[in-house]
Amino acid sequence: MRFIKKYPLLNIVNSFLIDYPAPPNISYLWNFGALAAFCLGIQIVTGIFLAMFYVPSIESAFSSVQYIMRDVNYGWLIRYIHANGASFFFICVYIHVFRGLYYNSYITPRELLWNLGVTILIVMILTAFLGYVLPWGQMSFWAATVITSLFSAIPVVGEYIVIWLWGGFSVDNATLNRFFSLHYLLPFVIALLSLIHVAVLHESGSSNPLNIALSVANKVPFHPYFIFKDLLGIIFFLIVFCYAVFFKPDSIIDPINNVPANPLVTPTHIVPEWYFLPFYAILRSIPNKLGGVITLGLALIVLFLLPFITNNVFKGSFFEISKTILFWSFFSVCVLLGWIGFKPIEDPYLMLGQMLTVLYFFYFFSLAVIVPTLQAYTFKNVFAK
């Protein structure tokens, strides 16, 4: 330890991974931050290798992906790790976010920490969308066309923004090139934001299931207790991940995307990847294009506002049955929105999507208005006596 503390860079590593004081009562739900970082590392490494053989051209993109799968040594493995790694990355991050919601990890003094996490999530969504376009299959092309066309809903300047995004008057070579460039760059932006996220975490301190402030004397060092706990989580993660890669590699890939992009043939039903589906359902639940875009934006912005619109007397859902019921209702709404996003735009799915969208926002309204009112009533009529 004396050797590590002698050098400034190693001393930073020591303060982050060895001597960092962590609450002794955190559960395995706190492992998913480390698992998300592990997934990000996998994505960056496999992405670099894939970029060596990928050709960002509408004539060659699809063929280059097939070349990677068939002729590059272990190219099939690298691609399947990258494709399935994206799904597992989102699984880890979504569990991380829902854990934060359940245990109120967004309240003082962790407002900045929470908002950095939401920023990382949004950059992840953008990066994943750009990557989904790169294979240049049928679904990739039409996903790029539909999603970028949403900017045309912006009054006055919308059409100009779409042309600027495309680099022309249609989705073409310029579009694919800039999508590839950004998809290669943004994972490093996510890595930088993650480092800042961890630095802020070490400044504000980790939360815990009881969400109570603990002194340093009541905490334990990160090593060896949580290092080995995280390693155990990574081992279990790798078992499930390897099963998906080696036995179910195509389970998340839309079969239509194995067909080269054809601008003259529109798929009967455009479905994005599963991790976009809840937001996709919110987007299309509003019949008006501009209204749908605004609603989608609000669905993400409200996550930023969460630390500032809630006023909690009790610090964690652990102590409040009302917030526990609200949380699991919200979780169910998100799962159902994902299911609705997978379905065609027709009744009854359209009506259900609109109802679930209202319930999505009702959760945040409840945290801002209804829960504080119940807390004030409880304090006044129960604890005051």
UniProtKB/Swiss-Prot annotation:
The keyword Transport applies. Heme b b562 binds at H82, H183. GO terms for molecular function: metal ion binding; ubiquinol-cytochrome-c reductase activity. It is a multi-pass membrane protein. Heme b b566 binds at H96, H197. One of its GO terms (cellular component) is mitochondrial inner membrane. The chain crosses the membrane at residues 32-52, 76-98, 113-133, 179-199, 226-246, 290-310, 322-342, 349-369. GO terms for biological process: mitochondrial electron transport, ubiquinol to cytochrome c. Belongs to the cytochrome b family. Component of the ubiquinol-cytochrome c reductase complex (complex III or cytochrome b-c1 complex) that is part of the mitochondrial respiratory chain. The b-c1 complex mediates electron transfer from ubiquinol to cytochrome c. Contributes to the generation of a proton gradient across the mitochondrial membrane that is then used for ATP synthesis. PANTHER family: CYTOCHROME B (PTHR19271:SF16). This is Cytochrome b.
